[in-house]
Amino acid sequence: MAGQSPPVLGVGLIGSGSAQAAQVISNDQLSQRVDTNDEWIRTRTGIGRRRVSTADQTLVDLAAEAGRSALTMAGRSPQDLDLILLATSTPDDLFGSAPRVQAELGATNAVAFDLTAACSGFLFALVTAAQYLRTGAMRRALVIGADQLSRFVDWDDRRSCVLFGDGAGAVVLEASDEDGLLGFLLHSDGARGAVLNLPANDTSAPLIAGAEHRAGGYRPIVMNGQEVYKFAVREVPAVLQSLLKRCDVSADQLDWLLLHQANQRILDAVADRLSVPGAKVLSNLAAYGNTSAATIPLMLDEAVRDGRVSSGDLLASSGFGAGLSWGAALLRWQGPT
């Protein structure tokens, strides 16, 4: 009938994939560079090692590998894709790396672009991609979270260099009668953004007589760890509780809590405030550290492949980080197990 709104479609989460950086750096190895030790790092962060890309391993390499793996699990070809969304803060090309991922995959029918929201990036990208599918404008999307924060870490600052690693994770979304994105909430607060950022260089250079310009490039990551912790343990439980209430779901109905892998203390505090038992909290911090936009899909893929997450499982997920940005999504996994 003329003027009738199109049906709102469900969004199925049907495949996952991940990719790891080539080099493994243990806490003991890192202590050879900075004044730290394994016990100090583990007790404060839960991290035992992290992966760091080699000089010839690009972000596109990691993102394409994760995407290819997700497509294989989903049983879809690159040509089936209508959309590729790459959540990253560390593109190989500042103008965008998603088109290069599209080319590497051979996804000739897909439009591809980057989305930057730091450690919340994957969750924001997942929600964004889902809207294209819900309207019927697109049928299938590949959402990738990938970062190489090792390029922007001050490796002589023991407070921050122990935290970060490189990696990528991906999920295939498909329009479906059964909805796998049951609800979401997203937030930003730029007024508090100074507690965690990766600022551009502020040095100037002469251009012509009477004029100057600011040189390109970025300074290392700047972080107030105490303030970031307070932000996370306050906002993440609150947004998850609000989402569960909106979706009429109780915490004890959840199969898994899938959080951004920033710090084990944060994961434990959020779970405690939600009364979610530790056995339901997914964590791979010990092996990978904080891989920024990659943490959620990388953790999901690992849990799917080792059999912890099964088709039909209900997951509450939250991403949080620089911006400040944070959000939550209630997901039902529909891929193979």
UniProtKB/Swiss-Prot annotation:
- Cellular component, GO annotation: cytoplasm
Keyword hit for Lipid metabolism: yes
Name the pathway: Lipid metabolism; fatty acid biosynthesis
Q: Which SUPFAM superfamilies match?
A: Thiolase-like
Q: Which residues form the signal peptide?
A: none
Active-site residue numbers: 119, 260, 290
Superkingdom assignment: Bacteria
Entry-linked CDD domains: KAS_III (cd00830)
Q: What is known of its domains?
A: The last Arg residue of the ACP-binding site is essential for the weak association between ACP/AcpP and FabH.
The protein's name: Beta-ketoacyl-[acyl-carrier-protein] synthase III
Organism in which the protein naturally occurs: Synechococcus sp. (strain WH7803)
The organism that produces this protein has a lineage beginning with: Bacteria, Bacillati, Cyanobacteriota, Cyanophyceae, Synechococcales
